[in-house]
């Protein structure tokens, strides 16, 4: 994933709210690769600042602590992920294009963005111990489940009768495969993305009546 570039982020007064919001977004996306390398347990804002090439003061200006930085960055990245896959779903002209497109998209995500996506599972695990992560997890999971609402709606529009009509069940199923093959990819299994692609296509076949 291409990271946003930050030429200069000044510690200006908080009177220009729209500008501050955009700078906060740029900073979080710029720091995302560093967060992905470290994970929540090992990260601290000083390390993130050094790895990202921005001052610690700038990070503290926009984020109170590492929890806020991590959750904000994960939500931003997942927003783009959800937007892209839902665009693909809505544009599919037929069931074969839909299943192939979704399978390719998810497999390519595992191949190219595994480190960033593991941050989501890191955040989800932290939410079991720290209430500060609850809002982030609820927001992201709602958006992820909505992908499967869009998928089932599209299949119905294309005339496909499905055995499963509960988007939550489909989310849990595909998310389980996603996490498994993501872990295999991170362990160095070069075949993981293609194996995931095959598994998603199999699930599509099982889904149709």
Predicted regions located by residue number:
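Amphipathic alpha-helical segments used for helix-helix packing
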Residues: 112-135
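Short, basic, alpha-helical segments at the C-terminal edge of helix-turn-helix-like DNA-binding modules
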Residues: 75-81
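Helix-turn-helix
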Residues: 26, 30, 34-68, 72
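N-terminal intrinsically disordered/low-complexity leader segments
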Residues: 1-22
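Solvent-exposed, amphipathic alpha-helical segments
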Residues: 30-37, 84-88, 119, 123, ...
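Anionic, Ser/Thr-rich low-complexity intrinsically disordered regions
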Residues: 35-38, 58, 140-148, 177
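Hydrophobic alpha-helical connector segments
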Residues: 75, 86-116, 167-171, 194
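Hydrophobic/aromatic-rich alpha-helical bundle segments in the mid-to-C-terminal region
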Residues: 132-138, 142, 155-208
